[in-house]
């Protein structure tokens, strides 16, 4: 049996969130942060490998309220710093600006952690390089939040581009999480069932597509 159920890899974000009504909140965020809390609160033994400028962000303290989480902090000379302006109450439409990003993860800085699932939960393309996927697959089942392959920081903003290496790398992926818009970028299909079938044919074993109805 593995020491941990999940190892979640990704940078934390220093977020400024402006709601549609003008309410402004400064917070720690990011996929690793929210996924870490969610996994821990299901009872999973969870390890997280967050990355940030540790002079600015206390990574252990950020996760301290979560049960069952072991933190392996990594230092970057820069952090992921962003501002999100939400235009609708459901937060589906937003404008994001990015002040800085982390130094990319490197395979050689990943500790020897025994986990059943390695969940790659970055925030922008390049933060978790493509070579991390086959590396992770040699250690565990691989889960990916595909935003880390589609969202690019350009001119201080976030734009989406297709994942050029998707057909090469999806066969390494056991669990693929995408939203409906990201699934359309990947496959060209607006129909979620068709998109899921295409992603499965390209090699992902289990696909979760989130959406608002």
Regions from the PLM with identified roles:
Residues 10-12, 31:
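Active-site metal-binding loops of divalent metal-dependent hydrolases
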Residues 24-37:
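Short catalytic helix/loop segments, enriched in acidic residues and glycine
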Residues 3-5, 14-26, 41-121, 126, ...:
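Conserved N-terminal subdomain of the carbohydrate kinase-like
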Residues 115-124, 148-158:
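Flexible, glycine/proline-enriched loop segments at strand-loop-helix junctions
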Residues 152-213:
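Conserved phosphate/ATP/ADP-binding segment of small-molecule kinases
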Residues 36, 60-61, 107-110, 129-134, ...:
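Short amphipathic alpha-helical segments and helix-helix/interface helices
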Residues 10, 50-52, 146, 211:
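Short beta-strand/turn micro-motifs composed of small residues
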Residues 142-145, 208:
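Structural detector of well-ordered beta-strand residues that form the stable sheet scaffold
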């Amino acid at each position: 049996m593995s020491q941990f159920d999940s190892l979640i890899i990704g940078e934390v974000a220093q977020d400024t969130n402006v709601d549609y009504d003008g309410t402004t909140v400064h917070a720690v965020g990011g996929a690793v942060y929210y996924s870490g809390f969610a996994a821990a609160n299901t009872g999973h033994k969870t390890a997280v490998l967050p990355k940030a400028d540790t002079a600015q962000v206390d990574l252990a303290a950020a996760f301290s309220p979560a049960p069952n989480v072991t933190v392996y902090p990594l230092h970057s000379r820069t952090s992921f710093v962003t501002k999100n302006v939400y235009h609708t109450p459901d937060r589906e439409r937003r404008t994001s600006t990015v002040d800085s990003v982390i130094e990319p993860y490197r395979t050689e800085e990943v500790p020897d952690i025994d986990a059943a699932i390695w969940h790659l939960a970055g925030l922008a393309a390049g933060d978790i390089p493509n070579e991390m996927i086959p590396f992770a697959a040699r250690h565990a089942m691989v889960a990916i939040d595909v935003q880390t392959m589609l969202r690019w920081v350009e001119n201080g903003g976030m734009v989406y581009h297709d994942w050029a290496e998707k057909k090469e790398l999806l066969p390494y992926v056991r669990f693929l999480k995408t939203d409906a818009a990201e699934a359309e970028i990947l496959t060209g299909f607006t129909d979620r069932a068709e998109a899921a079938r295409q992603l499965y044919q390209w090699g992902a074993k289990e696909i979760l597509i989130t959406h608002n109805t």
